[in-house]
UniProtKB/Swiss-Prot annotation:
The active site is at T37. SUPFAM superfamilies: N-terminal nucleophile aminohydrolases (Ntn hydrolases). Transmembrane segments: none annotated. Belongs to the gamma-glutamyltransferase family. PROSITE patterns: G_GLU_TRANSPEPTIDASE. PANTHER family: GLUTATHIONE HYDROLASE LIGHT CHAIN 2-RELATED, PUTATIVE GLUTATHIONE HYDROLASE LIGHT CHAIN. One of its GO terms (molecular function) is glutathione hydrolase activity. This is Glutathione hydrolase light chain 2. Pfam families: G_glu_transpept. GO terms for cellular component: extracellular exosome. L-glutamate binds at T55, E76, S107, S108.
């Protein structure tokens, strides 16, 4: 999945002027969205960086807690596929994601650290909103707070619907529809991004207001 050949195959399927039906992309798996997830981004004085995401998967995980520690148990096994069983998100089973010893399930979590050719970190950000925040910051020149707060869109192929946040620019929605996207307004926010960016004056951090929380530094 990290090879240049695989990336080139995916890139060749992208059309600037139109979207395509699901069969065009020849999908072999689908990635569900996690519900009970938190992310932490940290950069130390010496430039050491940590991007860590933790999850119990669905909201309230398995809805079972330990009677001793009162820790809530996760239901991460639902991220695996099982033959003839459709998961919590309505995603049909995928052979590539079947349960096997020593295997991790597919996940929409995407902790990321980006560095330039000289090893200096230009930025870092999460799944669909992660590349959007990176594009806003690196390509469009938005500061980290604006990049994190910009309205988002999401398409996970199945269902083949492009979900947009309620406050997105209508011109964006119109442009998507001219490319044959079926759009709908998200009932809530689309994921959450926490980001730290190296600037000319030092470091800038942003905590997504979609989920509360604040950046902190010393």
């Amino acid at each position: 999945m990290t090879s240049e050949f695989f990336a080139a195959q995916l890139r060749a399927q992208i059309s600037d002027d139109t979207t395509h039906p699901i069969s065009y992309y020849k999908p072999e798996f689908y990635t569900p969205v996690d519900g009970g997830t938190a992310h932490l981004s940290v950069v130390a004085e010496d430039g050491s960086a940590v991007s860590a995401t933790s999850t119990i998967n669905l909201y309230f995980g398995s809805k079972v807690r330990s009677p001793v520690s009162e820790i809530l148990f996760n239901d991460e096994m639902d991220d695996f596929s099982s033959p003839n069983i459709t998961n919590e998100f309505g995603v049909p089973p995928s052979p590539a994601n079947f349960i096997q010893p020593g295997k991790q399930p597919l996940s929409s979590m995407c902790p990321t650290i980006m560095v330039g050719q000289d090893g200096q970190p230009p930025s870092h950000a999460d799944h669909t909103p992660m590349p959007q925040a990176i594009i806003y910051n690196l390509w469009f020149g938005y500061d980290v707070k604006r990049a994190v707060e910009e309205p988002r869109l999401h398409n996970q192929l199945l269902p083949n619907v492009t979900t947009v946040e309620r406050n997105i620019d209508q011109a964006v929605t119109a442009a998507l529809e001219t490319r044959h996207h079926h759009t709908q307004i998200a009932s809530t926010f689309i994921a959450v991004v926490q980001a730290i960016v190296r600037t000319a004056g030092g470091w800038a951090a942003a905590s997504d207001s979609r989920k509360g929380g604040e950046p902190a530094g010393y």
